[in-house]
Amino acid sequence: MGKSGGRKKKSGGSNSNSSQVNSSETSGLSKPSTIVNGGVDFDASIFLKRAHELKEEGNKKFQARDYVGALEQYENGIKLIPKSHPDRAVFHSNRAACLMQMKPIDYESVISECSMALKSQPGFTRALLRRARAFEAVGKFDLAVQDVNVLLGSDPNHKDAGEISKRLKTALGPHQDLQSRPSPAALGASAALGGPIAGLGPCLPSRNVHKKGVTSPVGSVSLPNASNGKVERPQVVNPVTENGGSVSKGQASRVVLKPVSHSPKGSKVEELGSSSVAVVGKVQEKRIRWRPLKFVYDHDIRLGQMPVNCRFKELREIVSSRFPSSKAVLIKYKDNDGDLVTITSTAELKLAESAADCILTKEPDTDKSDSVGMLRLHVVDVSPEQEPMLLEEEEEEVEEKPVIEEVISSPTESLSETEINTEKTDKEVEKEKASSSEDPETKELEMDDWLFDFAHLFRTHVGIDPDAHIDLHELGMELCSEALEETVTSEKAQPLFDKASAKFQEVAALAFFNWGNVHMCAARKRIPLDESAGKEVVAAQLQTAYEWVKERYTLAKEKYEQALSIKPDFYEGLLALGQQQFEMAKLHWSYLLAQKIDISGWDPSETLNLFDSAEAKMKDATEMWEKLEEQRMDDLKNPNSNKKEEVSKRRKKQGGDGNEEVSETITAEEAAEQATAMRSQIHLFWGNMLFERSQVECKIGKDGWNKNLDSAVERFKLAGASEADIATVVKNHCSNEAAATEGDEKKVPAP
């Protein structure tokens, strides 16, 4: 983009006002375009407009937490603005805000950016606030106090500055007066008035102040100039005596800042003494106008109020105070079209206020001269990610102040009210101190001043940053997250995800498996029967006990089936389900015997079906286990297998003894021994099931019971049972009851 050799375009037939840059296009760029011979420097206006666009892009990136991108946009915008332009302060302040969000925080860079912002625009509120925080963070409390004093001098109700001031008072000790030293931003005003700067090196001799110079009262605040229509930033002037010296501490404490009314050119304000101040003319008193609010939070409707032209940050605080339980919310208003519009900035909040005022003007029989319309706001709960990110302060050139009603009063009334306000403030401070000293919790937190001073001196001398470990922790977590992000997106991570998924699947199935085991154990409860009672009572008790145990077995079956639905190859669940079917069949047979009814008329189909189901599940579980065991053995034999370590750890947990030290690796021989033990348990359980079935079939006179008995004996032998134990079991079979009573030991007849 090149310039045309300094050639200027002239505006034919238009006045100077039409040739100036529109303020809405530059969003508060205070300097108009340079006018040369009735023309406008369009190149400068284009640069300023482009700088504003870059600032908006930087704000969007800041809201998206892309702080590096926002820094670049602000830097590019600074390059387009002349060095003497006051709007450079906004860009430098925004860069400082980005630097304070980037971990670890480079406080020296933050201080440098804020200092450049104050160089372009002295007294810039946001730059002073951020520089004060940076000074506080690096332990330069004296410099932080100076910036806080300027903030509190221009706005005594500044919330953030008040909080920092309290912390600095604690850090500097109870005897440190925050008002004792001027701030760097006030150096220019003090030097211009000839006042020496105390506490900042050697004092220069004061210069005489001309009578035609500025003779504002103590702490006066300049108001908007009505002649040019531009709003100038309020500038706080340090108290000055008639001799040019600064007002003493005791005198300055009795002064309350009051805005001066627009006086004609001939009027002057003079100081009549060092201890009292007289004001010539009339003084305007500030009274904040409040706008009524109606909050709609689900079914909860509450009333509230906010200052007219309130900032969005203050509105968020009001909502939080009215609804303490709310966390992340959206604040919406209804526009003129009846749509709910979300408020995300102060500019949009002003639109909402305008919409409320428009509704007020449409209402008849309403005094519209001094009325403020009620604003209806809808508060909606959202997730923290959806809540609009609240900037530390909205980046606009001129900070909007609440609308102030002007009440004309006499000078004597103003001064008397000043004294009353000061006395009330002193009394309130004394009451707060008294109440805080009476609090027992506060007493417990008190510490000796010398200890705190020594710690502060030690930290300042050594240069220890108390928050360094927090910054390092956050930096480490960020690096860990970046490394993890690169790892999880690689191809090598997918097998690990599959393995983790299988582990969680097994854990979930194991939970249902254990849940079912609880019901199986509960079913073993011994329920006493009153044999002395009548037959009907005993029968009822028996029926109740049968139903209760049956219900426990049914619940166990449901849990085992859920475990198998989660992990179909969960052989433990299949074995447990077979055990449940076997116990259910035994329950049917035991209930039949307890009733002492004729067996010949009983239908055994349901009981035999349960035995068949148990045997089928036992067979399927055995085959499933054999396949898994074969695969595990292959993994152990293969030295290059990735699963060798995993299988070894699992075997170590299963076969470890608390008194003996288990080796770190399990050999193939040890794994084979453990597999043999598991196989023996399966055979033993299978043999018991076949033995019980043979007894039921023998009792009901069904053919084939001896075949099941022989199969049971074979299973016992495969399980490794001794011959004596097997002979004892066969002897107790129901088919040998007659032989057992006679005392003769007979073999089981062959089928």
Curated annotation (Swiss-Prot):
Domain PB1: start-end pairs:
290-382
What changes when the gene is disrupted? Normal constriction of plastids during division, but impaired separation, resulting in plastid clustering. The clumped-chloroplasts mutant phenotype is transient. In juvenile leaves, clustered chloroplasts are observed in almost all cells of the petiole, while in the oldest leaf, the phenotype is mostly absent. Phox1, phox2, phox3 and phox4 quadruple mutants show a 70% reduction in root hair growth.
GO CC field: cytoplasm; nucleus
Q: What induces it?
A: Up-regulated by heat.
Q: Where are the TPR repeats?
A: 51-84, 89-124, 125-158, 434-468, 481-514, 536-570
For bias type Basic and acidic residues, the affected ranges are 421-443, 630-648
Comp. bias regions, Basic residues: 1-11
Acidic residues bias locations: 390-399
UniProt entry keywords in alphabetical sequence: Cytoplasm, Repeat, TPR repeat
Q: List, alphabetically, the InterPro entries matched.
A: PB1-like (IPR053793), PB1_dom (IPR000270), PHOX1-4 (IPR044517), TPR-like_helical_dom_sf (IPR011990), TPR_rpt (IPR019734)
- The annotated region (Disordered) lies at 1-33, 386-443, 630-663
Any GO MF annotation of the entry? mRNA binding
Main subcellular localization, coarse class?
cytoplasm
Record CDD domains: PB1
Q: Where is the composition biased (Low complexity)?
A: 12-28
Q: Where is the composition biased (Polar residues)?
A: 409-419
Keyword Nucleus assigned to the entry: answer is no
Superkingdom assignment: Eukaryota
What does the record say about tissue specificity?
Expressed in roots, stems, leaves, apex, flowers and seeds. Detected throughout the petiole in juvenile and young leaves, but restricted to the petiole midvein in older leaves. Expressed in hydathodes, at the base of the trichome, in the vascular cylinder of primary root and lateral root, in emerging lateral root primordia, in pollen and in developing embryos, but not in mature embryos.
Would I find Nucleotide-binding among this entry's keywords? no
Q: Where in the cell is it found?
A: Cytoplasm
Whom does it interact with, and what assembly results?
Answer: Interacts with myosin XI-K.
What's its job?
A: Required for plastid separation and partitioning during cell division. Not involved in plastid constriction or in the organization of cytoplasmic actin cables. Contributes to polar growth of root hairs.
Return the protein name. Protein CLMP1
- Species this protein is from: Arabidopsis thaliana
Gene of origin? CLMP1
